[in-house]
Structures are given as structure tokens and as C-alpha cells.
UniProtKB/Swiss-Prot annotation:
Interacts with MYCBP and AKAP1. Part of a complex containing MYCBP, AKAP1 and PRKAR2B. Interacts with CFAP61. Belongs to the CFAP91 family. Involved in sperm flagellum axonemal organization and function. May regulate cilium motility through its role in the assembly of the axonemal radial spokes. It comes from Homo sapiens (Human). This is Cilia- and flagella-associated protein 91. Signal peptide: none annotated. Keywords: Cell projection, Cytoplasm, Cytoskeleton, Differentiation, Mitochondrion, Phosphoprotein, Spermatogenesis. The keyword Mitochondrion applies. The lineage of its organism: Eukaryota, Metazoa, Chordata, Craniata, Vertebrata.
Amino acid sequence: MSHAVTIEEPQAQPQVSQTRYRERSRAGSHISSNRAYDFLYDPLFIVSSEKDHTQANIQATLIRSRLRKVPRFKTMFSNLIHYPRYSLYWSKSDPVPPFISREWKGHKEKHREALRQLTTTDASFQMPKEVYEDPEVTGKNRYKYFERPFLPFFQQMPFNVVYAVSKAEPYTFPPTSTKHLSIPSKSTVGTQTDYRDADVQTDPYSAEYVVCQDSIPELLTLATLTWGRGLPAGQAEVEMIERAREKRAWEASLPALSDTSQFEKRRKMMNEMERKEWAFREQEIEKLQEIRLEVLKELLRKREENQNEVNMKHLNARWSKLQEGKEAKMAKIQRTHVSTIRKLVGKRKNIEGKLERRNIIKDYSDYASQVYGPLSRLGCFPDNNSEDFVVKNYYLNTYEGLVELESCLPDFVTQPQIRAPKPKVITTKAGFLKRAARLDYELAEVHKALLDKKNKVLEVKKPPRFLQRNPIPQPRLPTPTLEMTSNEEEEMEMAVIYLQKLLRGRVVQNMMFEGKEKRLELIQELRTCHALQEDEKLVKKAEKQVTLALQRQRNLHEHKVSLVENHLAGLEGRALADMFDFLSKELVRLQEERRIHAFVMLAERQRRVREAEESGRRQVEKQRLREEDEIFKEVVKVHHSTISSYLEDIILNTEANTAEEQARAEIEKMAEKINDIAYEMESRRTYLQSEEIVAELVYSFLIPEVQKYFVKEKVRNAQRKHILAAHQIIHSYTESMVQKKLTEGEQDEASNAAMLLEKETQNENNS
């Protein structure tokens, strides 16, 4: 909404005092820039169109809402949707009295503007007089004419300050910085805004005016020209004003309508003026078409130039790319060619493969030989120790040395003076060319002609690559001829031609009638504009008044209907908005609920999958731990059994050795005693006693010993499989050795047993 403040005459409308509306919000209070119903009461409040007037009415209705909230005591503290805390009802109290018109004031202005335009087109029409209310300059409105303009940035300065001579003030040292900086009383702050000056430009101000009676100012005929649409005026606007003046002069020269004798002259003048206007309109249309055609040609030309430029860029890029590829391939081929030629030359130097002795004199005489330039691929690097020969100079390797060396240089080295060369004089004092200059010019022309002739290439017309077909012109159609065989056919042909003429004329008449029926309203309008009789004028005026009354009645009815529709639409809109808001929130809630449910299901599924995977991993880990525990137990058990068996064997062997030693000692003692007793008994025994001793030895010693040996062998054979299994688990690779040892032990035991049996038998035989 645009607020334009102009000075108008106060209209006779009832003023209703209103206080400035204060709009309160949750954040705090806010004072609006205008009152709610200023568009109805304030004569200085102007809107640009009926749309803005309707918008202001809607805003006032929304601000002063007539909907009232009535609390429900049963569900006053409820937050549920189906148990609302309050209900809405429409208040019957209207802040605007019924006698205040809510229509837009612009209709009256449009009606007044239409009357003004009618006065410019029809000189016979008299504009109704406007009665202005007394401004009461000497009465109650006198104070308005003593108000001076307020200039916010204007400040009157005394003349002694304006014309004072500026004096140079002595320099004063700034004071020492204190602990706290002084805060200036005023500060200038710059701001930047997104708005431009063009966004706030309005039409220039035009003051109010009063038209004198029986006068039509020429300036009012230019009311259609506005700023940016005809203003500032150009050549076209000046020509339009001149044509309007000529037309007004022509209308003034027309004969009066009351003079019936000049009716034919008036009609001819109007026809001529109409033809001139149509001719001028055709010229304007042709000019516009030519301008549009030129603009179209220029656009097409620019588009073609841009397209050609883009195509040339693509072609140049493609050509440069192909050229680079070609040059790279050529360089590669050249390098390959040189390398191949060098290899062929090296091979052909000694085709027969003879061994030649080195010619030292030839090598040292040839500076291209390997003596002076050895090949690095053979392991020779002539510049390997080149750094040993680098000269280290203080004046060249250090900055101080360079500065000292530069200070020793003369000035013309560091500060050169460039002198412009003198121009070569090619003319004499008389103004003629010198002979040398003329000869140089002639030689340059001859050289240029020779170069042009040398570089000129005869363009050979290339034969076409494919066969081209020469177009054969189409033969012309033969001229039709009509041959009449008899007079009857000729008469029939003439009758047909005449019938065709009648049909064409009838068609033209029908087209004219249809055009007249289509443009009947325009014809009636032209007839009303150029009515000839006073009675018809009165009739037209009465019809016009009736039409205006009907229009006002229709506007009033439409305004009332629009108000009712606006209120109903507002109620429907609020109800639909609440309903749609509730439905949208429910839809969002259901969607969120479904989405959350889907997330829950997905999370539950992932949790189950992870639990299954974790349980599987846990079972596998437990199984692996059990297997490792069993393996560890078995290994420990085997180790313990091995150690216990090893210790047991050691203890048993020790016990056996100790017992054997003790037994041997005891046996030796007993043997000595027995030997003594035996010698004593041997000296005293008889044959029967000897037989009895042998039998007792056999039955009491030999047979129990053999039985004891067989029992031990059975026990050893029973334990042997367990020992073999333990040894196979621990020492699988020593199985063969153990087997050999066992077999050897068995053989030894068998041999020992056999030897014992043999000894026993020998002893028996000896006894």
C-alpha cells in the first residue's frame, strides 16, 4: 500500500474520533504508523487503487477482529483437540457505523476524470459545476496557513561566522593518554541498505487546481502523460500535441449541427478528417513495423556473429590441438630417424667384421672422438669432479663483497644516461628528397614487388570430388486455349460467367452485412457521439443518467456482496485453515510415527542380527577356549606323566642300583660265609647230601626266578602300548628309534634269558 499525502479540500463527511491503535503482542507493545480506519475517515489518506483499499479494509478487519473467544468451564484447562478450551463466536458490534460508506473514493475521481476527457473530445459537452466547501481561511482553519516548513538539516548561521577569515591555529601537543579514553558525545555512523533510489521514486508533485467555468485549459488535455510515460516530452509527444491542437481548430471550424444546410459540408469534412487519421495511423503502424524489423535483423545478425565466433573458436581449438599432435609425431619420427641412421652408419662402418687396431693419432686429431667427449653410457663422466675447479671469490659469492664491488664502479654504469638518437635527415634544405633516400625507397618497392611475385601462388581450380548434377529447368506449362465449337456453347459459357459474377457479388454483400452486424455496437457508439438533433441528445442524456444510476446501484450491490463474501470467505478460510492445519499435523504425526516405527523395526532387526552374530561368535570362542583348555590339560597331563615316569625311572634305577650294591655287598659277605660254610660242608658232605642240595636249589631258586621273570615280562608288555602312545604324541619322530631300541632290548633280554638258562643247565650238569 502506498501512502501519498496531498493537500485537498476537506469533504463533508462525519468525523469519528479515534484513538491511536496500540497493537500488543507477546514480545511487547507496538504502536502502528496509522489508525485502523484511516482509509475511511482521514481525507489525507490516499491509496493508489481499489486493490489497496480492499487490502486496507482486510487489515483493519484482521486487527479489529470481531471473533470473540468464550471459555468453556468444563474443559477450561484442557489441551486436547477434541476438548477445546474455548469456542469462537461472531460479535455483532461493528466499530464502523452503518452510515459510513466503505466504498473506494477513487470511483468518484474516475467519474470526474471521464468527464474531463469527454470535455476535451466533445466541445459541446458542458462539465457540471463543482461546488467547493469554504476553506474558512479566516475561521477555524486559520492556524493551518501560519505553519512554516520544517527543514531538519537547515541551520541558520550568523554572518560573522560565514564571512570569518580562517586563521592557522598553533600546533598543540596531544595530551598524555589517560587510563580511560574519553567517550565522544556525538558519533557519525554509516549504514548500508538494500534499497535503491529508484525504488522510492514517485510521480512529481502537482498542486490542486480549480477550473474556471466555460473554459477548457489545454494542460488538462495532457492528463494522460505521466512521468516515464510521455514525460519528459520528446518529439513524438510534441507532434501529438500539435495534432490535438489542429484537431481542436478543425472541430471549431466545423459547421454547427443545428444548421441543416451545412450538413453535407460537415459530412465531407468529417470523412476527409477520418481518411487523414486512418492514413496517419497506417504510417505509424508502418514505422513501428520497420523499427521492429530492423531490431529483428540486428538481433539475427548479432546471433549469427556470435555463432560464427563460437564456431571459429571451436575450429581454432581443434586445429591447434591437431597441430600440436602433428608436431609431436613429427618430432618423434625425426628422433627415430636420426637414431636409426646413426645405428645404420655404425653398422656399415665395418661390414666384414674385421678387427681394426686403434689409431691414436686419428682419435686425437678428431675433436668429435671419444677422447674429447667420452660417452656416459660407457661409464665415463668427464665433469664428475668439476666442482674442484670452481673459483671461490669473496666479491662474487657474498652480499658484502657485491656491495663493495658495486661501490667501486663508476656512475655511468649504475646510472646510465640514454640519449635519444637524432632523426635521420632525408630531405635537403630546399625540401626535396635526397638521392640516397630516393634510392632506398625505390629499392624497397622493388624488393616488395619481388617478394609478392615470389610468394604468389597460382590457385589451381580443384576438380570436383564427386559428380555434380546440372539442374535441368522445368518446362513451362502450355498456355491453355479454349476452342468453341458452336454458338450454343459460347452462350452457355457467357451465362456461366455471368452467374459467377452474381454469386461473387452476393458473397461480398453477405460479408459486408456480417461485418456490419459484428460492429453494430461501434456504429451505435459513433452515432451517439455524432447525434444531430437536440431531442436525441436529451434522450441520450437520460439514457446516460439511467445507465450511471444502474452502474452506481450495481457497484453498491457488488460492494455489499463483496463484503458478505469477504466475511464468509474469512470464516471459511479460518475454518479450512484450522482443519488443514489439524490434518497436516496429524499427517505429519502419522508419518513421523510410521517413520519411528520403521526405525524401531530396523533397529530391532539389527539388534537381533547383532545378537545372533555375537552369540555365534561367543559359541565359537567358547568352543575354541574349551578346545585350548583340553589341549592344555592334555599337554600338562602328558608333561606331568612324562616327568613322573622320568622321575620314577630315575628313583627306581637309583633304588635298584643302591639295592644292587647293598645286595652285592651282602651277597659278598653271605658268599664268603656261605663259601666258608660250603667249603666246610663240602669237606663233610656225602653224595646224598649233594643230591638233596641240587634238588633244593632247583625247586627253591631256579623255578621261582623263571616264573618271576615271566610275570615281569607280561606286566612290561601290558604297559608298553601306553608308553608307545605317549611317546608317539610327544616325540612322533623318535618312534622308529624307540622301536629299534625296544627290539634290541627284547633281543638282549632274550639273549640274557637264554644265557641264564644255559648257565643254569651248565650248573645242573656240573652239580
